[in-house]
Amino acid sequence: MESLWRAETKLPQFSRLEEDLQTDVLIIGGGMAGILCAYFLKQAGVDYVLVEADRICSGVTGNTTAKITSQHGFVYQKLVREFGPDGARLYYRANEEALAAYRELCRSIACDFQEKDNYVYTLNAPEKLEKEISALVQIGARAELAQPSALPFPTAGAIRFPKQAQFDPLKFVNGIAGGLKIYERTAVKSFDGKAYRTDRGTIRANKTIVATHFPLWNKHGSYFLKLYQHRSYVLALEYGLQLDGMYVDESGTGLSFRNQGDLLFLGGGSHRTGKQGGGWAELEQTARIYYPGAQIKYRWATQDCMSLDGMPYIGQYSKQTPDLYVAAGFNKWGMTSSMLAAGILRDLVQGKQNPYGELFSPSRTILRPQLAANAVEAVCNLLTPTKPRCPHVGCALKWNAQEHTWDCPCHGSRFGQDGKLLDGPATGDLSREK
């Protein structure tokens, strides 16, 4: 169950931290967001160190479908409603700038970067289509209605964003990570003030960026209330069909399509982590129906942090932690979100203003309908009298029969059949008692 990217690209390896050290900025987390933060800080001449508990890109970055787009489902009608046209326009501009930054960097990196139109389609909700295009017109986005002809089933229409992009994320990381100051297999266990303890050394940092997918600490920021996680699945098919762009269903449980070379990526089967969902079985059935004879070359799964309002949390970790920063809640759009997070955090740690800082601030209101849903989920699973329990906050774990893992429906931690930690926010393995 290895992704295409992991199978075909070998990343540079970095040593483990074996001593105490001091730095201006500590970056915790070696996925796309953390690595881009390190790259930008190096370019700015800022002293930094990045630490990764495993290997760089061993998490979501190595399992993405790697679409680079400012079209994040039918999100703009929601953003106009909740943040007004100005807020929605800022969100669009921030993501367009992220796309432009990738385009510029990829001029000198061999990472299969290709411009592609992106389509978000709907199967049966033309009214949502009309509301979305109206919101896009209102904010001045480059978008138009379209009738997708490349999909193997009828739709009620789509919205097209021209000149978006796709790439190979690990080849891209290969192009920028080689000269960065990185320590792998170096997990931060705790912190006291500005001292961060790892297995074999203490790092003293003036400022710290937490880019660990799900933030590490519950004490500040209430991220255990503000985030939940989703599983998604991908099949890479040998079929010989070349699409005219990238496609994704506006429904959170729908299908996505794109090519990578001669392969066709079929994504979907999504569900909240710890809940039942279609998984690979759903995708295999879809492939048999629409692409008969297709051979499965690769299959993999990924996990995404979802915010309460559809926008990432980027900025100061909490109001009580002035020198601690975070990037989290990318809502399945990690490529553009990683780039814009790196740009915002590069400025903030240097004491500079950023035009998008206020919009993405983690301290914005959490009074959203999803908050109540998250709270109900947590209470129900805390009261469920079964074992094993998640070491994060004690929720009852659910068995994932497709992936043979124990999954937490509260916050998304995952454990292997042997109890080994696979995904946070939990920071340790399951106890032997079950």
Task: Indicate where each model-derived feature is located.
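Flavin (FAD/FMN) cofactor-binding and adjacent substrate-gating region
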Residues: 2-7, 74-80, 103-172
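Glycine-rich FAD pyrophosphate-binding loop
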Residues: 43-63
